[in-house]
Curated annotation (Swiss-Prot):
EC number assigned by the record: 2.7.2.3
Protein name: Phosphoglycerate kinase
HAMAP family (UniProt xref): Phosphoglyc_kinase
Domain of life of the source: Archaea
Residues that bind substrate: 20-22, 35, 58-61, 115, 155
Record keyword Kinase present: yes
Subcellular localization, as worded in the UniProt entry: Cytoplasm
Pathway(s) per entry: Carbohydrate degradation; glycolysis; pyruvate from D-glyceraldehyde 3-phosphate: step 2/5
Signal peptide: none
Biological source species: Natronomonas pharaonis (strain ATCC 35678 / DSM 2160 / CIP 103997 / JCM 8858 / NBRC 14720 / NCIMB 2260 / Gabara) (Halobacterium pharaonis)
């Protein structure tokens, strides 16, 4: 059993709330605040219920271009929330603990980037995570722990799995919604159609195998680099450029796709045509019979969109992960746009996080879907039936 905010006595309680606000940055702030907006419901509810909220989060990877403090995140949260949000430039120091202790009920403080401390970028067993400096120093200042960061639930890091070893633990509203939808795919309306695209070829093939073997998918539609891997496995000569792109992503993808086709060819659908860039820099669509092409496939073509739309029109549930092409380039956004529009006609439409959500946001159709996951890797892991350590840590 996992306790939720409905089970929490929040009034006056000091809460450590793990959120995921890892966002693209710009020179003057945040380039995208979607992840911050996702947690508004949880944080506002806790503040409205007079909790004293200490927010835990990370930004970027050590040494990366987007590795930074969380001051701009605190400023944006303060703008988004009805409740005031302060910023503390430390995470578990005496100052941080004092700031939590002195918080008035109904207020929040965003503590410093948890990844400023090397322990947070390591994996631990939960019992060992509870002994790290971050958890052992900060936990005594808290009465309970709330994990609302579904996007990090697959990472066995101290701020995810350590606190539940020391404190009563609860799922926030984002976590609760994600588990309710992604954890109950088997009871979603049938037929279930998975649309797998993007560049995470190995992950997508793993999802396809898992849902097909477990009987959760009636059809799997492939696109993007994933679709190209299946075409190559099926003997289609896409051209050296497309093959190189697939091999750069995974040396095993074509073999894995071929093995899956051997087992489930009747349920796996591949592109019928692709779009490439010609010498003039224009979009040109080619049927498979007209390949190979000298330039890499950048999108699916109109024939593929029409064929996939026919399947999606009859879908009870459409589960999408990954774009159909290089949607960032306006010349090659059509396949993703039209394919995803078709998916919204399903009785229930579910979108994985990461690049998929970014594509929908750029194309202006994000709000048309029933559920948009906040997690990329976590959503993929859950779709493959893997256990998420951050979720298991919340179980009583």
């Amino acid at each position: 059993m996992i306790r939720t905010l409905d089970d929490l006595e929040a009034d006056g309680t000091a809460l450590g709330v793990r959120i995921d606000i890892n966002s693209p940055l710009s020179s003057d702030g945040l380039a995208d605040d979607a992840r911050l907006r996702a947690h508004v419901d949880t944080v506002e509810e806790l503040c409205r219920r007079d909790a004293r909220v200490a927010l835990l989060a990370h930004q970027g990877r050590p040494g990366g271009d987007e590795f930074s403090d969380l001051e701009r995140h605190a400023e944006r949260l303060d703008e988004l929330l009805d409740a005031p949000v302060e910023y503390c430039d430390s995470t578990f120091s005496a100052e941080a603990r004092t700031r939590i202790d002195e918080l008035d009920p109904g207020r929040a403080v965003l503590l410093e980037n948890t990844r400023f401390y090397s322990e947070e970028y390591m994996s631990f067993e939960p019992s060992a995570a509870a002994e790290t400096y971050l958890v052992s120093r900060l936990a005594p200042a808290l009465d309970a722990y709330v994990n609302d960061a579904f996007a990090t639930a697959h990472r066995s890091q101290p701020s995810v799995v350590g606190f539940p070893e020391r404190l009563p633990a609860y799922a926030g509203r984002v976590m609760e919604r994600e588990l309710d939808v992604l954890g109950n795919i088997e009871s979603s309306p049938e037929p279930r159609v998975y649309v797998l695209g993007g560049a995470k070829v190995d992950d997508s093939i793993a999802v396809a195998r898992s849902v097909l073997e477990r009987g959760l998918a009636d059809s799997v539609l492939t696109a993007g680099i994933v679709g190209n891997a299946f075409l190559l496995a099926d003997g289609v000569s896409l051209g050296a450029a497309s093959a190189a792109v697939v091999n750069e992503r995974s040396h095993e993808a074509v073999k894995q796709a071929g093995d899956l086709l051997d087992d489930f060819s009747h349920r796996i659908y591949m592109p019928r045509d692709v779009a490439v860039e010609n010498d003039a820099g224009e979009r040109v669509e080619h049927d498979l019979e007209d390949l190979p092409a000298s330039t890499p496939a950048m999108d699916i073509g109109a024939r593929t969109v029409a064929a996939y739309a026919n399947i999606l029109d009859d879908a009870g549930t459409a589960i999408l992960n990954g774009p159909a092409g290089v949607f960032e380039d306006d010349r090659f956004e059509t396949g993703t746009l039209e394919l995803y529009k078709s998916a919204t006609r399903a009785e229930q439409s579910i979108v994985g996080g990461g690049d998929t959500a970014s594509a929908l946001r750029k194309l202006g159709i994000l709000e048309d879907f029933d559920h948009v996951s906040t997690g990329g890797g976590a959503a993929l892991n859950m779709l493959t039936g893997e256990t998420l350590v951050g979720v298991e840590a919340l179980r009583e």
